[in-house]
Amino acid sequence: MRALRAASIAVLAPLLCAQTVNLNDLLASMRKRIETADFRATGHLVWVQPSGVRLSYPITVKARWFPGVLREFVEMGAAARTPGNAPPGARLATHALLEMRPNGQSSISIAHPGDKSPTVLPVEKWSEGPLGPGFGYEDLLEQQYFWTGQASEGKARFGARDCIIVKSTPGPTDRSHYAQVKTWLDPSIGFPVYVEKTVKESGVVKEFTYYGIRHEEGVWSAHQVEVKVRGQSGSTLLILDRGSARANLTLADFSPAQLTKF
């Protein structure tokens, strides 16, 4: 019996170590993807109403990592027509400047046509977005990979992909309106295929599904991300049609002064 126990430990120990290393390697891969970002992409943010009617808004996203901070500049135009039940932000063009710092001190500023100066959003409004709470501003940051709380919840299959589920929880200094984020990561490419984000206090769960995952210019990306609020009808789609994974952006591309220029 003692020999059997020793043999079991000898077999299990490497497996447990491999799981730990695998999680660390996955997180390192995700962080590296963000810390080497330098892209520009254009496409549409699409609001799919419960009735199935779609409203499309042009969007441009550019992002680059600078020492200690990821900067993103988002430009969203107004739709050709806007129904009466549309969120207030959907009626106006929107500019947003997002800054993500690994120490948790991220920030989000937005502006609309006619604004003399941008508005710095408090954390409690990070769940909001141009089209309502489905796809919020914070969802563009992917800061969960830098949070202090990281744990593996084992393996799972999502569609045709074998994934490892990573549970990320913010620490006391991490600014976020999420209580936790669970990510289904494909370890063979180091890229998410599905994500569940739980909102603080309300417990609302938002589901993000990645479609059209591709490898271009040495970078993995998704052609489309669909966001659904669990238990609610309708969805929001972020569709990226074209762009460059090596855009050679500079600090001038992220000047706060650009927020009020429409």
Model-derived regions, located:
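Flexible, processing/modification-adjacent segments and terminal tails
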Residues: 19-28, 32-38, 44, 53, ...
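Bacterial N-terminal signal peptides that target proteins for export
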Residues: 1-8
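Hydrophobic h-region of N-terminal signal peptides that target proteins for export
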Residues: 10-19
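Edge/loop elements at the starts and ends of beta-strands within beta-rich repeat scaffolds
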Residues: 31-39, 67, 215-219
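Extended lipid/amphipathic-ligand handling interfaces
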Residues: 30, 59-64, 209-215
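One face of beta-strands
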Residues: 39-43, 59, 72-74, 106-108, ...
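Gly/Pro-enriched, hydrophobic low-complexity segments
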Residues: 79, 85, 128-143, 152, ...
